[in-house]
């Protein structure tokens, strides 16, 4: 089983990645992946997309048909359009309910696997030291702070270790972002080909020099 030290670090890394990427972006990606699976919701989504295409096609046909010169054809297209539109709205409403339930489940899992798990570990292991400090290495006042609130004196508590992990992960993420921006700005740029005006101007300049 991984040590408590590693578990807390992983929780903060995952939390930072979620906050950096964006919870809504992750939810949308998971929803798209969920629709790729063979389930009832994916079938509803396929049917909804099919009905949407059919509604758009019927709308184009109605616009291309004169309601005065070809009234019978236009009326038939209108009835098909209205019926298909009702089916589309029903499927769209059902799909919206599925997505709301899916988003709630994803948010619940994300909360309990990050913030909820972190709070539980801090409560359950509040008296458990993450690691011990060498005796006499630092003043006892600092030892008391590092063991706050309930870990034995001379050790590092899970609360303090969690704060250290959050700070280090955030600084590391910012440093990676700065390096990425620096490397991107230093990337070699392709030279733009000379325009015809520039090419024609060069021979003229040479002739003048001669």
From Swiss-Prot:
Signal peptide start-end: none
Coiled-coil stretches: 39-95
Annotated localization: Endoplasmic reticulum membrane
Lumenal side: 1-4, 132-155
Family, per entry: Belongs to the WRB/GET1 family.
Complexes and interactors: Interacts with GET3.
Stated role: Required for the post-translational delivery of tail-anchored (TA) proteins to the endoplasmic reticulum. Acts as a membrane receptor for soluble GET3, which recognizes and selectively binds the transmembrane domain of TA proteins in the cytosol.
Designated name of the protein: Protein GET1
UniProt source species: Coccidioides posadasii (strain C735)
């Amino acid at each position: 089983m991984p040590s408590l030290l590693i578990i807390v670090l992983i929780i903060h890394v995952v939390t930072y990645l979620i906050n950096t990427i964006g919870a809504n972006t992750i939810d949308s990606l998971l929803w798209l992946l969920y629709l790729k699976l063979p389930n009832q919701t994916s079938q509803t989504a396929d049917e909804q997309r099919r009905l949407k295409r059919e509604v758009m096609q019927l709308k184009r046909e109605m616009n291309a048909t004169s309601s005065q010169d070809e009234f019978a054809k236009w009326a038939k297209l209108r009835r098909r359009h209205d019926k298909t539109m009702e089916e589309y709205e029903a499927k769209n409403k059902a799909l919206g309910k599925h997505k709301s339930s899916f988003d709630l489940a994803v948010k619940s899992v994300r909360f309990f696997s990050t913030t909820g798990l972190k709070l539980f570990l801090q409560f359950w292991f509040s008296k458990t030291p993450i690691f011990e400090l060498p005796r006499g290495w630092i003043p006892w006042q600092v030892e008391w702070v590092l063991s706050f609130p309930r870990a034995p004196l001379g050790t590092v508590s899970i609360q303090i270790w969690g704060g250290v992990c959050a700070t280090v992960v955030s600084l590391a993420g910012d440093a990676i972002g700065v390096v990425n921006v620096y490397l991107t700005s230093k990337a070699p740029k392709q030279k733009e080909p000379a325009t015809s005006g520039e090419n024609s101007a060069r021979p003229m300049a040479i002739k003048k020099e001669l």
